[in-house]
């Protein structure tokens, strides 16, 4: 009987051992070939991917970084090392963690790691632990500007670039501000060679063109506004305030002098600035500003248009004298000049006996050439030179002179000056407004 009890106990123990052995084998078989490392299990890896789809993993990452992330690029696209997937994975002692992309972490055997790296199958070996990150300065949580690194990857800040360089041991530098790729730097604008100072000839030509323009405006004004016998006295200018040049230049000066201080300030001169078409207009008026105060007085304005060397008839006479060199030029035409150096209205050729009419620049008037003497009306304008104002008056002054009567014994008109009232000025302004000039 005792022997039977011993055999029964032994049989029960053997059965228990068999059951436990099978249970352990079943557990071992479920672990797969990687014995004991559940992190290498495919089911666990799929769970990591599921976390990514559910947005659990990304909440630990930099939102501003992944906003610009391109999954098609390799992993060395400058992930934030502090958010590396391997930091959350703990491999067995004989394995090391590597990342296959920005969301997948794998535990790989150390003995298989080096051969796979040589073949290039593993993108990058990551840190065994966070010890390498201790020496790198972390970046503050603050909004910053994105930069492009020398490795061709975009970083959310310069600090992130430096952190990545520190943690990986790479030598990185900032190529440009903003995301990669860096746009080519625009070529520095080719500055046009600054225009050299205007020559005296250019200034004289410009002054001559401006005088012609002022003359045309003045002529149109006198043609449109015809003073009548009833309002002539009230509508004429007070000649005592006119500049020293009393032709179209004086008329233009008074048109520009809006505050009637006999000075043209820059705002008043700007009314005739044509920089786009006349690049020398500013140099012209700057050269006339003798006192360098930024304003033109009436004398400076008049002198501005009588630069020496700009007198057409006098220049022609000088040219003829140089050609003759003391010899008599028989049969040659010799022009007639006035005291200001411009052409007289009537010109005659002594050899042919023909006469014709010209303007002050010597241009012949069409149909005026005749055999013998011709009657040419003298110009109503002079060059604007000093002293020329006494011989020529404005058209509206001529109408006024006809009412005053004959000249005195010395041939001078008897002019009675009177003060200009505010009502007279208002009437004159109203007439000017009706014309509608465009300066």
Swiss-Prot record:
Keyword Secreted: yes
Residue span, Kazal-like domain: 130-182
Subcellular location: Secreted, Extracellular space, Extracellular matrix
The UniProt record lists the keyword Signal: yes
Keyword set, alphabetical order: Disulfide bond, Extracellular matrix, Glycoprotein, Heparan sulfate, Proteoglycan, Secreted, Signal
SMART domains: KAZAL, TY
PTM entry text: O-glycosylated. Glycosaminoglycan that contains chondroitin sulfate and heparan sulfate.
Entry's Gene Ontology BP terms: cell adhesion; central nervous system neuron differentiation; negative regulation of cell-substrate adhesion; negative regulation of neuron projection development; nervous system development; neurogenesis; neuron migration; regulation of cell growth
Molecular function, one GO term: collagen binding
A Pfam family of this chain: Thyroglobulin_1
Residue span(s) of domain Thyroglobulin type-1: 310-376
Membrane-spanning segments: none
PROSITE patterns: KAZAL_2, THYROGLOBULIN_1_1, THYROGLOBULIN_1_2
Residues bearing attached sugar chains per UniProt: 228, 383, 388
One term under GO cellular component: extracellular matrix
Disulfide bonding pattern of the chain: 86-97, 91-107, 136-166, 139-159, 148-180, 313-337, 348-355, 357-376
Secretion signal span: 1-21
Superkingdom of the source species: Eukaryota
Function: May play a role in cell-cell and cell-matrix interactions. May contribute to various neuronal mechanisms in the central nervous system.
Descriptive protein name: Testican-1
Species per Swiss-Prot/TrEMBL record: Homo sapiens (Human)
Gene: SPOCK1
């Amino acid at each position: 009987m005792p022997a039977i009890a011993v055999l029964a106990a032994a049989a029960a123990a053997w059965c228990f051992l068999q059951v436990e052995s099978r249970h352990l084998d079943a557990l071992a078989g479920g672990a797969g070939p990687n014995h004991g490392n559940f992190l290498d299990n495919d089911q666990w890896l799929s769970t990591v991917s599921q976390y990514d789809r559910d947005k659990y993993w990304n909440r630990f990452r930099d939102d501003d970084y992944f906003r610009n992330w391109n999954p098609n690029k390799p992993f060395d696209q400058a992930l934030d090392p502090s958010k590396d997937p391997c930091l959350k994975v703990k491999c067995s002692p004989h394995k090391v963690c590597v990342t296959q992309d920005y969301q997948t972490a794998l535990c790989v055997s150390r003995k298989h790691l080096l051969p796979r790296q040589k073949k290039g199958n593993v993108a990058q070996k990551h840190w065994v632990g966070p010890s390498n990150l201790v020496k790198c300065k972390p970046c503050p949580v603050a909004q910053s500007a994105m930069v492009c690194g020398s490795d061709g990857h975009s970083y959310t800040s310069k600090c992130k670039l430096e952190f990545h360089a520190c943690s990986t041991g790479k030598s990185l530098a900032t190529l440009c501000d903003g995301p990669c790729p860096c746009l080519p730097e625009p070529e520095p604008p080719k500055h046009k060679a600054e225009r050299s100072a205007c020559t005296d000839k250019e200034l004289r030509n410009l002054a001559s063109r401006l005088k012609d323009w002022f003359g045309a405006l003045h002529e149109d004004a006198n043609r449109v506004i015809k003073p009548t016998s009833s309002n002539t006295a009230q509508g004429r200018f007070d000649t005592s305030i006119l500049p020293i040049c009393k032709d179209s230049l004086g008329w233009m000066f008074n048109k520009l002098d809006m505050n009637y201080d006999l000075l043209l300030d820059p705002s008043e001169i700007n009314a005739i600035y044509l920089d786009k078409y006349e690049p020398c207009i500013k140099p012209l008026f700057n050269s006339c500003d003798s006192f360098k105060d930024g304003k033109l007085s009436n004398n400076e304005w008049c002198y501005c248009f009588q630069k020496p060397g700009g007198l057409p008839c006098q220049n022609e006479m000088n040219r003829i004298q140089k050609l003759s060199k003391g010899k008599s030029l028989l049969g040659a035409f010799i022009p007639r000049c006035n005291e200001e150096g411009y052409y007289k209205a009537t010109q005659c050729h002594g050899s042919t006996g023909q006469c014709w009419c010209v303007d002050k620049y010597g241009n012949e008037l069409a149909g005026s050439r005749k055999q013998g003497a011709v009657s040419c009306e003298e110009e109503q304008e002079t060059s604007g030179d000093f002293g020329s104002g006494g011989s020529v008056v404005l058209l509206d002054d001529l109408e006024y002179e006809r009412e005053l009567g004959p000249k005195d014994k010395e041939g001078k008109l008897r002019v009675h000056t009177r003060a200009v009232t505010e009502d007279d000025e208002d009437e004159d302004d109203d007439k000017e407004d009706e014309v509608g000039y465009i300066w």
